[in-house]
């Protein structure tokens, strides 16, 4: 099974929202790309997935989340990181993310409890870490390739990736041929820049295999925040905290981490939420 994506528009939107430096755009872009594909691989329409990579690099934690259509959102703790390029002239994603830490994967599959998995960071380059997650946590042989090409003006030129997973019945000939194809495959952004589309890329990495396109999606960078969600989050703070906010500030602002949208609440609105909080407490058995 193969999932592939041209995530240029998604990563571009993330860069515009978070105003990331080049290396952080590459890091967050890779994680957004992987998360979108992993979300689209979920079977239930209402399923969702969240990835968090928490390394010891200057970028801090990166968090992304996607629905089953591949629509994705994300943010990074430190959006601006300036570090030297690697010796080969490429962006040092590993240097920004760090080599020590963990990759966490949380899947909401509509069950009582979400599935939680985590693995130590393998390389900090994101793709290798995704591959390690599938091998260790889900025991699925996987190839993951991710790429983000950033222009000198910090805009995103190309971004994309693919995930290949072997079926349990795959024989050695299939595995050997796939390994050969992957080794000679050009970087995803190189293929996109040359004019290849996603189907071309899949056919390239699966050369020698019969390729059938099962379905296509058009995922976007899409935030799920709303005023109602923010109100529920505020209520969860408790009436004491809300009363304090109402007394101290004439207007309170709450900013969404994923899209930077600001929600404003007057002190009267905060007091009303506090009353709702108290009512909720009163009706508890």
Residues covered by each model-derived region:
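Cys/His-clustered metal-coordination modules, chiefly Zn-binding fingers
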Residues: 183-285
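Interaction interfaces in information-processing and related assembly proteins
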Residues: 1-215
């Amino acid at each position: 099974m193969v999932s592939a994506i041209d995530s240029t528009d998604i990563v571009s939107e993330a860069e515009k929202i978070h105003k990331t430096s080049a290396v952080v755009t590459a890091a967050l872009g890779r994680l957004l790309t992987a998360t979108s594909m992993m979300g689209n691989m979920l079977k239930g329409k209402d399923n969702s997935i969240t990835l968090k990579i928490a390394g010891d690099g200057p970028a801090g934690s990166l968090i992304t989340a996607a629905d089953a259509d591949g629509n994705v959102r994300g943010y990074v703790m430190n959006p601006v990181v300036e570090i030297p390029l690697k010796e080969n002239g490429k962006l040092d994603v590993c240097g920004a993310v760090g080599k020590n830490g963990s990759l966490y994967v949380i899947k909401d599959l509509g069950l009582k409890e979400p599935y939680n998995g985590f693995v130590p960071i393998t390389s900090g380059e994101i793709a290798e870490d995704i591959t390690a997650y599938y091998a260790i946590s889900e025991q699925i042989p996987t190839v993951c390739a991710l790429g983000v090409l950033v222009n000198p003006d910090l805009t995103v030129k190309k971004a994309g990736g693919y995930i290949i997973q072997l079926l349990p019945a795959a024989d050695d000939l299939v595995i050997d041929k796939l390994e050969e194809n992957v080794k000679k495959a050009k970087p995803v952004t190189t293929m996109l820049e040359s004019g290849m589309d996603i189907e071309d890329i899949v056919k390239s990495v699966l050369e020698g295999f019969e390729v059938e396109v099962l379905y296509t999606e058009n995922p976007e960078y899409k935030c799920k925040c709303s005023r109602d969600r923010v109100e529920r989050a505020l209520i969860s703070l408790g009436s004491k905290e809300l009363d304090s906010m109402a007394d101290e500030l004439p207007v309170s602002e709450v900013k969404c981490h994923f899209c930077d949208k600001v929600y404003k609440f007057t002190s009267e609105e905060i007091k009303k939420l506090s009353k709702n909080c108290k009512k909720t407490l009163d009706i508890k058995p």
